[in-house]
From Swiss-Prot:
The keyword Metal-binding does not apply. Gene3D superfamilies: 1.10.8.590, 3.40.1280.10. Belongs to the class IV-like SAM-binding methyltransferase superfamily. RNA methyltransferase TrmH family. One of its GO terms (cellular component) is cytosol. It holds the Pfam family SpoU_methylase. This is tRNA (cytidine/uridine-2'-O-)-methyltransferase TrmJ. Its main location: cytoplasm. Homodimer. The keyword Methyltransferase applies. InterPro entries: Alpha/beta_knot_MTases (IPR029028), RNA_MeTrfase_TrmJ/LasT (IPR004384), SpoU_MeTrfase (IPR001537), tRNA_m1G_MTases_N (IPR029026).
Length: 244
């Protein structure tokens, strides 16, 4: 199951951080590392700081875009240390671990970490179902990348160990199949095109409404069957609009 947990690093700028993250992952039983458009490629420093976790570095998936790293995932959680203008469903690290293990039993889960200096952009955070914030000392809350990964990875491992020790998993059981990130993005594209065609949103300012709708559907988290119903509704609206 732990192989289904992806640690995704976006535009990492120091190879030493890649190695330190790999070490933090492997100590908690995680090995699935994805690097999104890294500003430098893994090198000897990454291997040195991996300290026995060089296999995690060697097997890392390197992709150009975040969408590629999220493809096939049913749950995406992004790390965020700042309050945003558009509030989003939040988890603490323990909740993140529980939810990741529950859903990781059935489909890949992505835990996304941003750039060393500026974190994730708002656009990247809007691709996530939830945001997770680490409740560090408010007077000195600066965690480096590997520290943040270690905290989240530890909570994932604790949730996984609890599930192993119980006849019934000690995590929330996800009965309903949730759509993959790819399916959700197609739905958002379909929704935007339909709302543009009906004149509900303006072609030159679609973002504000679409961002709020993304937040709404992220909070509601429709199941796969429910998403298919929504897609059918949009198709029906399109047909009616064409007939006018």
């Amino acid at each position: 199951m732990l192989q289904n947990i992806r640690i995704v690093l976006v535009e990492t700028s120091h190879t030493g951080n890649m190695g330190s993250v790999a070490r933090a992952m492997k100590t908690m039983g995680l090995t699935n590392l994805w690097l999104v458009n890294p500003l430098v490629k893994p090198d000897s420093q990454a291997i040195a700081l991996a300290a026995g976790a060089s296999d995690v570095i060697g097997n890392a998936q390197i992709v150009d875009t975040l969408d590629e790293a999220l493809a096939g995932c049913s749950l995406v959680v992004g790390t965020s240390a700042r309050s945003r203008t558009l509030p989003w469903p939040m988890l603490d690290p323990r909740e993140c671990g529980l939810k990741s293990v529950a859903e990781g039993q059935h489909a890949p889960v992505a835990l996304v970490f941003g750039r060393e200096r500026v974190g994730l952009t708002n656009d990247e955070l809007q691709k996530c179902h939830y945001h997770v914030a680490i409740a560090a000392n408010p007077e000195y809350s600066s965690l480096n990348l590997a520290m943040a990964v270690q905290v989240i990875a530890y909570e994932v491992r604790m949730a996984w160990l609890a599930a192993q020790e119980q006849a019934q998993p000690a995590v929330e059981h996800e009965e309903a199949p949730y759509p993959l990130v790819d399916d959700l993005e197609r739905f958002y594209d379909h929704l935007e095109q339909t709302l543009l065609a009906t004149g509900f949103i303006r072609p030159n300012h679609p973002g504000q409404v679409m961002n709020k709708l993304r937040r709404l559907f992220t909070r509601a988290r429709p199941e796969s069957q429910e998403l298919n119903i929504l897609r059918g509704m949009l198709a029906s609206i399109e047909q009616q609009n064409k007939g006018k």
